[in-house]
Each structure stands twice: as structure tokens, then as C-alpha cells.
């Protein structure tokens, strides 16, 4: 069985694959000061809940954008599962080519997302990942990663309003009853949720104009479903796109 781990700034996504089938998956809060032993306890409990025998794990693929946790999870895999994890980065063979100024700056999660989307939908394809930041990645028909965009995440945008505007407060990230809000809560929900849908539409339209063609737009991440419901710019939502990308990369490099 293959263990896939996507370590983000806000959440850690964990998946266990039996061949090509995702048999169990979890999402936990990222705690960048936790040690390998602490994550081991957490993972052990999750495996118990999911009925996963840790002795059956014979491979591990990790994407990490939180440098302090890279070593901790490498240690966890070596000591607990007795496997050497594949730590994905821009030098990891994926079959994609990178036509950007500094490939090393690409997050491992974006690489995994790009490969998974390209393998499933072909190219050109645009990938959106709604996380702490929202990333846009563009892959051409011949598997060339040509760039993208980064925008502040939905949560960051809402938190900034709450922290920096004295009379505003935290609100639930849900669709308001109407675009024209009747109270402060609905005003903020309209601006954040529907405004973000407009941001997505604007960037996707501009990217497709530069490509010279329309193409599939694949979204992933915790708030992907919420935004996809508000715009036709998103073609489909793939909740486990990053984990699937890690699986594909591992299979390409397992030898």
C-alpha cells in the first residue's frame, strides 16, 4: 500500500492507496512545531480508525511546502514504516516540462496537481487549488508547464477584513442570500465569496485568451466546491487531485 501526504500551510492531507484505489483519506491541521513522534501518534490513531494495517505500507510520497516539517515526516516514514519517502520537488521526474524562470520555486503540491490534471484531462488544462493561497497552473497540450498565478486565499482575505477593519468581524464562509447584501454579514460574504468567484472568472478568461483556446478548468482544495457552485469558469472539482498526483509520481519513480 502507498501512503501519500500533502503538507500544506493550513492542512495536511493524507491518503492511503491500494494500487490505484484511494482506500482511506484524512485531513488534519498543520502544526509546524510538532515532532515526528507526535505526528506518528496522530497517524497511528487515524490508521486504527480506518482499519489500515501500517505493516502493509510499502511506499510513501510526500509534497511539503512547510520546510520545518520536511525532516519530521521523512523521519516518520523511515522509523515507523521502514520506507524511504519520495519527497517531490521540481527535479523529480514527472514527464512534465517546466517553461518558467525558476522551476525550483514551484511547490510540490502544484507539481502533483499539474500532473494529475494533465494525465486525467490532457492539455491544455488550467488547475486551481484553493488553499492558504489560491494557485492557478497552466499545462499545455504537450505536457509543458508554462506558469500560472497566485492569489490570496479565501480564508486569508476574510481574516484580513476581520483583523484590519475595526468594525468588521469573522463570518461563516457561505453563499449570501443575494449579491446585494442587507447586513454586514451578508456584505462580507458577498464580497469574499462572490467576489472571489469573479476573481476566478477574470483570471481564467485572461489565461484562456493568452492560450488562444478554451480548456478544462480543474479545481481542488477545501473551498473548491463552494466557489465552483458560483461560477461556470470551473469545469470540475477533484477533491483528491494532489494525492492522486503524488501516487502517479511515485509510480513513475518507484524503481
Swiss-Prot record:
SUPFAM superfamilies associated with the record: Actin-like ATPase domain (SSF53067)
Record localization: Cytoplasm
The entry's ATP-binding residues are 6-13, 132
Specify the pathway.
Cofactor biosynthesis; coenzyme A biosynthesis; CoA from (R)-pantothenate: step 1/5
Give the catalytic activity: (R)-pantothenate + ATP = (R)-4'-phosphopantothenate + ADP + H(+)
What EC designation does it have? 2.7.1.33
Q: Where does the signal sequence lie? A: none
Pfam families noted in UniProt? Pan_kinase
Identify the main location. Answer: cytoplasm
- Would you tell me the Gene Ontology cellular component terms? cytoplasm
Q: What class of enzyme is it?
A: transferase
Cofactor note as given: A monovalent cation. Ammonium or potassium.
Give the binding site residues for substrate.
107-110, 184
InterPro entries listed in its UniProt record: ATPase_NBD, Type_III_PanK
Sorted alphabetically, the Gene Ontology BP terms of this entry are:
coenzyme A biosynthetic process
**What does the protein in this record do?**
Catalyzes the phosphorylation of pantothenate (Pan), the first step in CoA biosynthesis.
Q: How does it assemble?
A: Homodimer.
This protein is called: Type III pantothenate kinase
Recorded source organism is: Roseiflexus sp. (strain RS-1)
Amino acid at each position: 500500500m502507498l501512503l501519500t501526504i500533502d503538507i500544506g500551510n493550513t492542512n495536511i492531507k493524507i491518503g492511503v492507496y491500494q494500487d490505484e484505489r484511494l482506500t482511506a483519506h484524512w485531513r488534519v491541521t498543520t502544526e509546524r512545531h510538532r515532532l515526528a513522534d507526535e505526528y506518528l501518534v496522530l497517524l497511528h490513531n487515524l490508521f486504527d480508525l480506518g482499519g489500515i494495517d501500517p505493516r502493509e505500507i510499502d511506499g510513501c510520497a510526500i509534497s511539503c511546502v512547510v520546510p520545518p516539517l520536511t525532516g519530521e515526516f521523512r523521519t516518520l516514514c523511515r522509523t515507523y514504516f521502514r520506507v524511504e519517502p519520495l519527497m517531490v520537488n521540481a527535479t523529480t521526474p514527472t514527464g512534465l516540462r517546466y517553461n518558467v524562470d525558476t522551476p525550483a520555486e514551484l511547490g510540490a503540491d502544484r507539481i502533483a496537481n499539474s500532473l494529475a490534471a494533465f494525465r486525467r484531462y490532457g492539455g491544455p488544462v488550467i488547475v486551481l487549488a484553493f488553499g492558504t493561497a489560491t494557485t492557478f497552473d497552466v499545462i499545455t497540450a504537450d505536457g509543458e508547464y508554462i506558469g500560472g498565478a497566485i492569489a490570496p486565499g479565501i480564508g486569508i482575505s476574510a481574516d484580513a477584513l476581520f483583523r484590519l477593519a475595526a468594525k468588521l468581524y469573522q463570518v461563516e464562509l457561505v453563499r449570501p442570500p443575494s449579491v446585494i447584501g442587507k447586513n454586514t454579514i451578508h456584505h462580507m460574504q458577498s464580497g469574499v465569496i462572490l467576489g472571489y468567484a469573479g476573481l476566478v472568472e477574470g483570471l481564467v478568461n485572461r489565461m484562456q485568451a493568452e492560450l488562444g483556446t478554451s480548456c478544462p478548468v480543474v479545481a481542488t482544495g477545501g473551498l473548491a466546491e463552494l466557489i465552483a457552485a458560483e461560477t461556470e469558469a470551473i469545469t470540475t472539482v477533484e477533491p483528491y487531485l494532489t494525492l492522486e498526483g503524488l501516487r502517479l509520481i511515485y509510480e513513475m519513480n518507484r524503481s
